[in-house]
Amino acid sequence: MDSRVSELFGGCCRPGGGPAVGGTLKARGAGSSSGCGGPKGKKKNGRNRGGKANNPPYLPPEAEDGNIEYKLKLVNPSQYRFEHLVTQMKWRLQEGRGEAVYQIGVEDNGLLVGLAEEEMRASLKTLHRMAEKVGADITVLREREVDYDSDMPRKITEVLVRKVPDNQQFLDLRVAVLGNVDSGKSTLLGVLTQGELDNGRGRARLNLFRHLHEIQSGRTSSISFEILGFNSKGEVVNYSDSRTAEEICESSSKMITFIDLAGHHKYLHTTIFGLTSYCPDCALLLVSANTGIAGTTREHLGLALALKVPFFIVVSKIDLCAKTTVERTVRQLERVLKQPGCHKVPMLVTSEDDAVTAAQQFAQSPNVTPIFTLSSVSGESLDLLKVFLNILPPLTNSKEQEELMQQLTEFQVDEIYTVPEVGTVVGGTLSSGICREGDQLVVGPTDDGCFLELRVCSIQRNRSACRVLRAGQAATLALGDFDRALLRKGMVMVSPEMNPTICSVFEAEIVLLFHATTFRRGFQVTVHVGNVRQTAVVEKIHAKDKLRTGEKAVVRFRFLKHPEYLKVGAKLLFREGVTKGIGHVTDVQAITAGEAQANMGF
């Protein structure tokens, strides 16, 4: 991570050099060469017919991998050809983990040729047959007319193909919701998930709060989860037409799980825990149009950058401001996104066509940052955000998912509950492997460094029963009569074959983002590594006596309370007051349970 990311934390790091990223990316449809990643500055001369002189627009050449397929036309294929097309569709769906995009009327090299109306109708009919064959559904995203070198109107059509994998109940995407206090995070989620607009006084957010003081103050202090479903046709499924979460899950082919995080600075540790432990696919950064970048906005942006979580931005409360105020806030965001240490390309979304393009480019390039402007009271532009979320594909590919599933089981314990007639229940994310009902696992480390045997009695995802949990999925696991007092946040449940190692001392390569004076041996910080959150003391700074803001070094930390389960390469974030730093674990000094007991005074 570039040390200049510290500027986004509100620190006083010396600014680095380097040019800012270019202008705001204008979201354009498939019919525009500049908006689709085609060659810039290279144009072929088109023929002049009927007074038209059009240049051939291009998409990037078709890639063998990925979930995007180009087809010039699909008119009356032979049976052999049809079977080949079906096999090809299965491959694209597998690459997109259940979603694929077909561009009809496009050559393999990306040239937008287009089809006449009859050919397009026949091609879509064939595509529908292919989808039926594999058990998928298709939705036409958009159509574009291209008239290059032709007197007859010709169109290209972009089609979304969606199929829930056989081993899953629905496609799942986790979105962390960030933003300053009072920016409207919980209100927006209430509007999306309840299906009713806000009254301007926070009515929509009431169902999301978990504590009385949250209802009284209107401010989130804990992590809550809300779900928004989409059926196979891309239609919203929420509590407006479903009474329970189970009904939403049953009716949805794609599920968006929103992780609502706290905006107030006093709850920053909770927000960091939500980002590091719940492994969101991406983040939604909410910015109030009337206040702009204020409070913790810049710090939350810096957290997303430091943890390499892709994010998009929603400018809320546009009903309270003049148009010029909204434009000023957008320009302010664009300047921050382009500055050194961020290097993002803003993409302002103002139409449904823009939303489709933004979803695709956001998935393909980590530098693209879509910006939406909307109101939770009037509902203006709310549909554009829904279109974006419906089309947004999983940001990890099938190969990465398959590799994780081949590893031994590892489940992060993030939440612990006691449920009547069920017993002890833990919530968290499966980092690797596969977990099934009845599996025998070990959980730890305990305060004395031990791992204890347990059995997974049942599994639930989004409040619906589930027999098998796969890597990357979040769920709750019932552990029966296992003693809750033996569990704590930060533990892991792993396969006994893993022979897990624990440590009290570890080393990490860090960048000190901000510190008021000098960072020295003996300084205490709160360390966040995945679902681990514990105070640690700096034992040694290699090759240096002290660190200043913006400097990098390898540092040895020691946990103060109890040993933890860490892995080399894990991302690390530490803070104490205004002191902040990021890095990754480079070495762990493994110890036995006996050594842990001796170190901790047992």
UniProtKB/Swiss-Prot annotation:
Tissue: Predominantly expressed in thymus, spleen, and testis. Expressed at lower levels in brain, lung, kidney, and ovary.
GO BP term, pick one: translational elongation
Pfam families with a match to the protein in the record: GTP_EFTU (PF00009)
Basic residues compositional bias, start-end: 40-50
Effect recorded for D319N: In JABELS; uncertain significance
Annotated spans, Disordered: 16-64
tr-type G domain span: 170-398
Stored InterPro entries: EF-Tu_GTPase (IPR050055), GTPBP1-like (IPR035531), P-loop_NTPase (IPR027417), T_Tr_GTP-bd_dom (IPR000795), Transl_B-barrel_sf (IPR009000), Transl_elong_EF1A/Init_IF2_C (IPR009001)
Record key words, sorted: Disease variant, GTP-binding, Intellectual disability, Nucleotide-binding
Transmembrane segments: none
GO CC terms: extracellular region; platelet alpha granule lumen
Gene3D superfamilies named among the record's database cross-references: P-loop containing nucleotide triphosphate hydrolases, Translation factors
Record keyword GTP-binding present: yes
Single GO molecular function: identical protein binding
Induction of synthesis: Up-regulated by IFNG/IFN-gamma in human monocytic cell line THP-1.
Residues at which GTP binds: 179-186, 260-264, 316-319
Record-stated family: Belongs to the TRAFAC class translation factor GTPase superfamily. Classic translation factor GTPase family. GTPBP1 subfamily.
Disease: Jaberi-Elahi syndrome: An autosomal recessive disorder characterized by developmental delay and intellectual disability. Additional variable features include ataxic gait and abnormal movements, visual impairment, microcephaly, abnormal foot or hand posturing, kyphoscoliosis, dysmorphic facial features or seizures. Brain imaging typically shows cerebellar atrophy and hypoplasia of the corpus callosum.
PANTHER family in the cross-refs: ELONGATION FACTOR TU-RELATED (PTHR43721), GTP-BINDING PROTEIN 2 (PTHR43721:SF3)
Name of the protein in its database record: GTP-binding protein 2
Organism: Homo sapiens (Human)
